[in-house]
Amino acid sequence: MHTGRYFAKNSYYDRTFNKQAVKILPGEYHATDSDTMIVTVLGSCVSVCIRDRLSGIGGMNHYMLPGEAGTDESPSPRYGTHAMELLIDHLIQLGGRLPYLEAKVFGAGRVINGVTDVGERNAEFALRYLEEREIPVTAVDVGDIYPRKVYFAPATGRAFVRQIRTGSIDSLFIGESS
């Protein structure tokens, strides 16, 4: 399957979870049908984790700005609309089915003082997009002033979020549902 230039391939062995992991950067996404952890770090950006709850096929995107931009010939996954379409299309190519998709939304921190709250707009976009497509949202961790590191295990549907605070790291467990 052709994965395209925005498909994250930066894989490594994650010692925290003792499994293979893929790190995604802004403007990238990853989708998988294997037991792979997907990881990213977010400030004002948003990551949406989507999985087929029956098959365990799932993935994560990482977009920087809400809505659409670019030309029709060159849409960019740095923008929410294209990031969501790329991820959902790839999940379906792997065998995921729209009626069984569910989502978790993370990020949208207000990490830079005095700047327009792009994080809030990013989160609003994600939640509106998912509602319009009737994809249920099972967990949300957005806002606040801290960056986050997000770990997503599509096979189980579990997500782990670590808020990155100056001088300490507080861990949160998000999304107990499988």
Swiss-Prot record:
InterPro entries the record matches: CheD-like_sf, Chemorcpt_Glu_NH3ase_CheD, Cytotoxic_necrot_fac-like_cat
The enzyme's E.C. designation: 3.5.1.44
One Pfam family cited in the UniProt record for this chain: CheD
SUPFAM superfamilies: CNF1/YfiH-like putative cysteine hydrolases
Keyword Hydrolase: yes
Substrates-to-products reaction catalysed: L-glutaminyl-[protein] + H2O = L-glutamyl-[protein] + NH4(+)
Biological process according to GO: chemotaxis
Cited CDD domains: CheD
Molecular-function GO terms, alphabetical: protein-glutamine glutaminase activity
Keywords: Chemotaxis, Hydrolase
Function noted in UniProt: Probably deamidates glutamine residues to glutamate on methyl-accepting chemotaxis receptors (MCPs), playing an important role in chemotaxis.
Family: Belongs to the CheD family.
HAMAP family named among the record's database cross-references: CheD (MF_01440)
Name recorded for this polypeptide: Probable chemoreceptor glutamine deamidase CheD 1
Organism from which the protein derives: Geobacter metallireducens (strain ATCC 53774 / DSM 7210 / GS-15)
Gene name of the encoded protein: cheD1
